[in-house]
From Swiss-Prot:
Similarity comment: family membership: Belongs to the glycosyltransferase 2 family. GalNAc-T subfamily.
InterPro entries: GalNAc-T, Glyco_trans_2-like, Nucleotide-diphossugar_trans, Ricin_B-like_lectins, Ricin_B_lectin
Transmembrane segments: 5-27
Effect of loss of the gene: No visible phenotype. It however abolishes Tn antigen in neuronal cells.
Source organism: Mus musculus
Reaction equation(s) it catalyzes: L-seryl-[protein] + UDP-N-acetyl-alpha-D-galactosamine = a 3-O-[N-acetyl-alpha-D-galactosaminyl]-L-seryl-[protein] + UDP + H(+); L-threonyl-[protein] + UDP-N-acetyl-alpha-D-galactosamine = a 3-O-[N-acetyl-alpha-D-galactosaminyl]-L-threonyl-[protein] + UDP + H(+)
Segments on the Cytoplasmic side according to the record's topology features: 1-4
Subcellular location: Golgi apparatus membrane
UniProt protein name: Polypeptide N-acetylgalactosaminyltransferase 13
Domain statement: There are two conserved domains in the glycosyltransferase region: the N-terminal domain (domain A, also called GT1 motif), which is probably involved in manganese coordination and substrate binding and the C-terminal domain (domain B, also called Gal/GalNAc-T motif), which is probably involved in catalytic reaction and UDP-Gal binding. The ricin B-type lectin domain binds to GalNAc and contributes to the glycopeptide specificity.
Keywords annotated in UniProt: Disulfide bond, Glycoprotein, Glycosyltransferase, Golgi apparatus, Lectin, Manganese, Membrane, Metal-binding, Signal-anchor, Transferase, Transmembrane, Transmembrane helix
Length: 556
């Protein structure tokens, strides 16, 4: 009896696969006669699902753990690309991934006539497995009628397998894949410009070379551009672990911002944006800035808005420059929450830059500050004083672009697009806060959130001793505010919450006192127990409770 049941199961399974084979054979043979683009678009995804063994390493985005015996070899290979190359090479180039979209996204219907796109991917000495996994994920999870081409821009790679071997391999793929070779190491910005110039699609989609696109990633991006060609759209960027290549869904409740040092940062989506969307998390999020690695833009609009600043070097700052330019010049920037693309986030870069990473990024950031930030560039210069010594080249062409596009001032951007910015729109002072008694200055000591603010000899060089007393009566250093939560308690640096309370300080310009409103105590000099941190004491009017708020300027 058991044998009979077993035979029936085997026969049923075999019959099912025969029917699948027949279906695919008929489907392929009739594909050229098919007019329904949506039906054709099912082919790559269907083929990928049927062909995948979901029990293999890394399938469904699961972590790959390397045995102890191979740990030393794994560590050596890790140094090549600054991610676990051994784990990556064990994973199939077209591995399966979970559907991490919100439930409401899975049932959305998009217009039939969407613009097509060229996908531009820049690489330099990229690992074979991560580069090809990026390409396969684009091809397998994109409707082919929307995929004009994939353009791989080789930024002067030195590895042999990225030469003829790669050229021969991509010829076998079912979507046109073009390889463009840069004559010399040019960096991400100029390589992307080269790829964009060669593109034919109505939309350009930029991806990094170590990404994985998920099911339904492309249609929501293109649909939003179809609605408004001046909208630049980004997917939610999911995290691919650099250690295990585990695929982890990113949050739809964060958006892009930046701090005084012009470092891109993720911050919680504010309530005002949730209210604008009426609580519908499947609607796009308006974001002040983008991370810059992954986005789609109408090709003609990319030209109209000024592409990239070609005077910038290699990488860094181009994402904020483009973000400011889009918003200030009449466009909009959004995170489309129904689109998910994974990205390998590395703890360190494997690349070297001429002059060093810091020099390159400082030059790029100074260019964007000079062109787009108006008087608010002082926040950047004062907290990063070394930047003013960097030669940033000629920005006259970019300033002319701003004039021709009739772009709005940076104050408008802060007021209307990023009102919760870490840069206050109105403030009383920007510079040092000096104690009259000790002649020492408040100093953040390079400390992080939840740590005590310090006090140190004044050096007049900005940096860690730059604080802003804002019109909202906060004392800010970068994106942290001075906070006191209990009587005589320590002065802690916490994320600015803009709700006053423990972060509200009253400065008396006559008595020179800084009174904490909630505790009704005054900021005082350090105690004998710890001479490196200020204290909170009952207000007495003593010299030790007197502070000079000085505006600082640096020659630029």
């Amino acid at each position: 009896m058991r044998r009979f049941v077993y035979c029936k199961v085997v026969l049923a399974t075999s019959l099912m696969w025969v029917l699948v084979d027949v279906f695919l054979l008929l489907y392929f043979s009739e594909c050229n006669k098919c007019d329904d683009k949506k039906e054709r678009s099912l082919l790559p995804a269907l083929r990928a699902v049927i062909s995948r063994n979901q029990e293999g390493p890394g399938e469904m985005g699961k972590a790959v753990l390397i045995p102890k015996d191979d740990q030393e070899k794994m560590k050596e290979l890790f140094k090549i690309n600054q991610f676990n190359l051994m784990a990556s090479d064990l994973i199939a180039l077209n591995r399966s991934l979970p559907d991490v979209r919100l439930e409401g996204c899975k049932t959305k219907v998009y217009p039939d006539e969407l613009p097509n796109t060229s996908v531009v991917i820049v690489f330099h000495n990229e690992a074979w497995s991560t580069l090809l996994r990026t390409v396969y994920s684009v091809i397998n999870r994109s409707p082919h009628y929307l995929l004009s081409e994939v353009i791989l821009v080789d930024d002067a790679s030195e590895r042999d397998f990225l030469k003829l071997t790669l050229e021969n391999y991509v010829k076998t793929l079912e979507v046109p894949v073009k390889i463009i070779r840069m004559e010399e190491r040019s960096g991400l910005i100029r390589a992307r410009l080269r790829g964009a110039a060669a593109s034919k699609g109505q939309v350009i989609t930029f991806l990094d070379a170590h990404c994985e696109c998920t099911l339904g990633w492309l249609e929501p991006l293109l649909a939003r551009i179809k609605e408004d060609r001046k909208t630049v759209v980004c997917p939610i960027i999911d995290v691919i672990s650099d250690d295990t290549f585990e695929y982890m869904a990113g949050s739809d409740m964060t958006y892009g911002g930046f701090n005084w040092k012009l470092n891109f940062r993720w911050y919680p989506v504010p309530q005002r944006e949730m209210d604008r969307r009426k609580g519908d998390r499947t609607l796009p999020v308006r974001t002040p800035t983008m991370a810059g690695g992954l986005f789609s833009i109408d090709r003609n609009y990319f030209e109209e808005i000024g592409t990239y600043d070609a005077g910038m070097d290699i990488w860094g700052g181009e994402n904020l420059e483009m973000s400011f330019r889009i918003w200030q010049c009449g466009g909009s920037l959004e995170i489309v929450t129904c689109s998910h693309v994974g990205h390998v986030f590395r703890k360190a870069t494997p690349y070297t830059f001429p002059g060093g990473t810091g020099h390159v990024i400082n030059k790029n950031n100074r260019r964007l500050a000079e062109v787009w930030m108006d008087e608010f560039k002082d926040f950047f210069y004062i907290i990063s004083p070394g930047v003013v010594k960097v030669d940033y080249g000629d920005v006259s062409v970019r300033k002319t672009l701003r004039e021709n596009l009739k772009c709005k001032p940076f104050s408008w951007y802060l007021e209307n697009i990023y009102p919760d910015s870490q840069i206050p729109r109105r403030y009383y002072s920007l510079g040092e806060i000096r104690n009259v008694e000790t002649n020492q200055c408040l100093d953040n000591m390079g400390r992080k959130e939840n740590e005590k603010v310090g006090i140190f000899n004044c050096h007049g060089m900005g940096g860690n001793q730059v604080f802003s007393y804002t019109a909202d009566k906060e004392i800010r250093t970068d994106d942290l505010c001075l906070d006191v939560s209990r009587l005589s308690g320590p002065v802690i640096m916490l994320k600015c919450h803009h709700m006053r309370g423990n972060q509200l300080w009253e400065y008396d310009a006559e008595r020179l006192t800084l009174r904490h409103a909630n505790s009704n105590q005054c900021l005082d000099e350090p105690s004998e127990e710890d001479k490196m941190v200020p204290t909170m004491q009952d207000c007495s009017g003593s010299r030790s409770q007197q502070w000079l708020l000085r505006n600082m300027t640096l020659g630029t």
